[in-house]
Amino acid sequence: MLLRGKTAVISGGAGRRGIGFATARLFVEHGARVAILDIDSKAVREAAAELGAGHVGIACDVSDAGACRAAADEVISAFGHVDILLNNAG
C-alpha cells in the first residue's frame, strides 16, 4: 500500500474488535499516521496508545458539528493535513 507518510482519520475506531481499529492497525503497519476519533474518550486514548507513538486518539461525537470541527483542528495541529478519511462511526 502507498500509505507511508500519509495521515488517516478514522471515526469510530476505538473498538478493538471493529473494522475501524483493524483498519487503523493496517494503516500503521503500512506507514501511515493515524488519528482515531470515537465518542468514548477512555477507549479512544487506549486505542491510540496501542497503535504506538505518533498516533492520536480524539474524543469526538460525530453527530455534533462543533465537536467535529474541534477534532479536525486537533488533527491538523498534530499532523498538518489529512490524506484519508474513513467515516466508520455508527
What are these regions (language model features)?
Residues 2-35:
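Canonical Rossmann dinucleotide-binding motif of NAD(H)/NADP(H)-dependent dehydrogenases/reductases
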Residues 3-4, 53-55, 74-87:
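A glycine-rich helix->loop->beta "capping" turn
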Residues 8, 20, 63, 72, ...:
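Ligand-binding pocket scaffold of soluble enzyme catalytic domains
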Residues 9, 35, 56-58, 85:
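Conserved Rossmann-like nucleotide-binding pocket used by diverse enzymes
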Residues 21, 25, 29, 45, ...:
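Amphipathic, non-transmembrane alpha-helical secondary structure
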Residues 38, 61, 83, 87-88:
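Acidic active-site catalytic centers that drive phospho-/nucleotidyl reactions
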Residues 39-45, 59-73:
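The beta1-alpha1 cofactor-binding region of Rossmann-like NAD(H)/NADP(H)-dependent oxidoreductases
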Residues 47-53:
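Short, conserved SAM-binding/catalytic segment
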